[in-house]
Amino acid sequence: MHRLPKKFSLVLFLALACIAIAAAQSNPAPSQDSATFDPDGTAHITRVVPMPATISTEAQSWLESLEHTTPGPETLAERRARTDVWRAQDSAEARKLYPVNVEEATTAGVRTDIITPLAMPAENKDRVLINLHGGGFNSDSGSLIEGVPIANLAKMKVVSVYYRLAPENPFPAAVDDAVAVYKELLKSYKPQNIGIFGTSAGAILSAEVAVKLKQLGLPLPGALGIFSALADFSRVGDSRQLFTLNGFPGQMQPTDEKHLDDQYVGKTDRKDPVLSPLYADLSGFPPSLLVTSTRDILLSDTTIFHRALLRSGNNSQLVVFEALPHAFWYHFQLPETKEALGTMAKFFDEKVGR
């Protein structure tokens, strides 16, 4: 996540070219908006973007604070180390705000955390959720941050999966691990009583796993939670061009070693229907909830996949939050986070096993 002042200027280049960050930062702030266009349609836009008045005061304060802790380019090792620090802090905060029991386990040979609500209604003992954490496929940014609040709010058991990470284990290793856990849970739960969800990389995996299960002829889960995802590794959505800017919340810095997409994709065809579910047969998909926000780098990709689900005749819901960056629901102090988590939990209660 990156830092945003109340009023700042930014130079956008809506193309696949790299952004000239140093030059943009050295230029004086413009007094008004302007735009020029190349013959190929590339836009060069100078904008003045004020702090949005349409979000909570807590969210405004948070966005303002992001200016002061913007990480620069980093190696994979540095990214993992930084992620481990804030994940531990945020996981502890999650467990304080949303009390649950957490037990380390191994499920189908895969490391998992079994997250159980302190008080689980009898009707929920036959329902379970699988959480696939975010982290760009190469680190763990949310195994407990995602699973703990949902287990507490939905009053359901959550199995959080520590799937194998790239680049050491590129696609389809993570999919295979998640499928193995799902198959193991099928021994104890009806498929319609299982839900799968995740944020960012975990959201992508949730869709990929559903496609893989369909290919394998296995029964599909009762619901999918796809919280800020892409479903096409062969093309870049518009919001990824728009928000991949230094200093603008929503940016995700690639590592210095290799682009994180390349690390995960490996040698797989980028239009492989499991890797990129947009190219799969999506008919018969479970009821799905997609959540994003207007400053999410994956806003475009999330909405593109939502439309694909609708075109295939599926029950798909899309919730778009105002003016907040990628995976903002990791930040528990925001009223918008409480609303987002409540929406997710309600969806699973209404769809899983119903």
Predicted regions and their residues:
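Short linear motifs in intrinsically disordered
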Residues: 2, 90-97
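Bacterial N-terminal signal peptides that target proteins for export
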Residues: 2-11
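Bacterial N-terminal signal peptides
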Residues: 11-20
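Boundary at the C-terminal end of the N-terminal hydrophobic targeting segment
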Residues: 22-26
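Alpha/beta-hydrolase superfamily serine-hydrolase fold, recognizing
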Residues: 27-40, 46-58, 65-74, 96-354
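Phosphate-/polyanion-interacting regions in eukaryotic proteins
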Residues: 76-88
